[in-house]
Amino acid sequence: MIVVLKHNVPEEKRNQLINWLKAQGLDVHPSLGEYQTVLGLVGDTSRLDMSLLESLEIVDSVKRVTDPFKCCNRKFHPDDTVVQVGDVRIGGGNFVMIAGPCSVESEEQIVYVAKAVKAAGAQLLRGGAFKPRTSPYDFQGLHEQGIRLLEIAKQETGLPIVTELMNIKHLPLFENVDVIQIGARNMQNYDLLKEMGSVKKPILLKRGLANTLKELLMSAEYIMASGNDNVILCERGIRTFDDYTRNTLDLAAVPMLHELSHLPVIVDPSHSTGINRLVPPMTLAAAACGADGVIVEVHNDPIHALCDGAQSLTCEQFAEVARKVRAVRKAVAE
């Protein structure tokens, strides 16, 4: 249920209503907009008298929300959420480029790539330290050493770092990580999602390879209902019957998610295609369809990469894509 308050309601009266609603056993999520305030109610609202609420002088309207996701629902929070990562704002009309290697391999590699992507316009550095691989025989990442190397790259460049958390026992290693990524394979690891609710860091939540948008939003709901509103959604391709690309990039999900939710939505053109020559056009398509950013894999020597070299751009290719993204964003804005 949502309660829309009239314009310019005094704070004292608003708080009186919020406290009364909490006394009814409900969680209240206020969204203070420029022109109206919306109170999102989570819990058993079946016994609330809608006509009584509507009769209050400070209430404009009351609506029941049938969607199972509440906290991330745009009806609860009409304005776009902007996730702040240092000086970087994700959402609210900004377009953020997150770039870096699939896996951290060495100090020389990660520092070189970090400097290159920053020079090209990337605002955040991605890099895998713990790698979930389909085969147990593939490179699994440098683990704790990989985190330390990311921290060195952060010190060298000032770029905030994004890396994947697979197991809650590794969380103490992530103290200097700026954005924690929950990968596609863990999108429905509900115990892990609930733990992310108590983490005071932004969470980048990737859509699972066979999950619906509702399931993605319900996973975001787990994090938000547990106390962390700083969630970034990521469309990274879904499994379909076609096998020319690794996955099928569902770009229609971007405007649909923006319609359903107030959370920022970014796109992963690397994992969704699996082919580096397809990454540039899909990056531009993401910029054109209204995404709030992209997360792109970049490697200084893709042919010899220990992980996913086939989908990685060279530093020079990324610089060219970043230049074109700026042109697309300008054209879309006009």
Which sequence ranges carry the predicted segments?
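Non-catalytic terminal accessory/regulatory regions of metabolic enzymes
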Residues: 1-97
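Active-site/ligand-binding-proximal alpha/beta "capping" segment
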Residues: 85, 224-286
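Active-site mouth loops of central-metabolism enzymes
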Residues: 95-112, 136-140, 160-164, 183-185, ...
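Hydrophobic faces of well-ordered beta-strands that scaffold small-molecule active sites
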Residues: 96-101, 125-127, 161-163, 180-182, ...
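Glycine-rich, proline-tolerant flexible connector loops at the mouths of alpha/beta enzymes
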Residues: 126-144, 300-312
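Alpha-helix-loop-beta-strand connector modules within alpha/beta enzyme cores
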Residues: 139-163, 195-202, 251-265, 311-333
